[in-house]
């Protein structure tokens, strides 16, 4: 996937703030899995219609299990950062075009309120036949997020309101393996 960031004008802080009301309208208890993206290698993206979630591997075929983390004790993949999930309305705002959503680097994009008040750590979500659990590890943007979506977007997702709503997304782990499909309901189970 080519990034083509030079062809895209990044939104200003005011333009991003104007999109908050739409993001806040995200469903609270039951939403939709809008997009599945597998990252087979660094910076590579595969858009999938269906995928398997596994206890050890996370999203099967994703490179999470091969990526080290400075946040893990042994420097290996962080077990509480197995899945990166972003609100579909938030990514639609910062990316400006559906073909740019995968550039965010998350594996799952859901139309669901990801705020800490709605999905505190420990909350379980069913997606297809799988169940995942929200973890306490914060999900923050990186230099790639800035280059793809702009400095104002990074400041927006990491602002006070951005952190309250988890606009950059949340981390989760698989607690029951299963199959997921784009269009599946995403339901709070606990």
Regions found by a protein language model. Name each.
Residues 1-190:
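Metal-cofactor-dependent catalytic cores
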């Amino acid at each position: 996937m080519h990034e083509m960031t030079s062809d895209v004008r990044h939104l200003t802080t005011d333009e991003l703030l104007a999109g908050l009301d739409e993001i806040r309208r995200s469903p609270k208890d039951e939403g939709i899995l809008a997009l599945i993206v597998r990252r087979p290698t660094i910076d590579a993206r595969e858009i999938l219609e269906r995928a398997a979630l596994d206890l050890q591997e996370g999203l099967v075929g994703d490179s999470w299990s091969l990526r080290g983390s400075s946040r893990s004790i042994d420097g290996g993949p962080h077990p509480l950062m197995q899945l990166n999930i972003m609100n579909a309305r938030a990514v639609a705002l910062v990316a400006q075009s559906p073909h740019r959503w995968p550039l965010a680097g998350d594996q799952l994009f859901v139309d669901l309120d990801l705020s800490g008040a709605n999905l505190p750590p420990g909350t379980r979500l069913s997606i297809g036949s799988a169940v995942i659990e929200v973890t306490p590890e914060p999900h923050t943007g990186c230099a790639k997020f800035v280059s793809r979506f702009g400095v104002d977007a990074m400041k927006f997702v990491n602002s006070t309101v951005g952190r309250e709503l988890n606009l950059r997304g949340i981390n989760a782990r698989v607690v029951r393996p299963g199959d997921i499909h784009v269009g599946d309901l995403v339901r709070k189970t606990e």
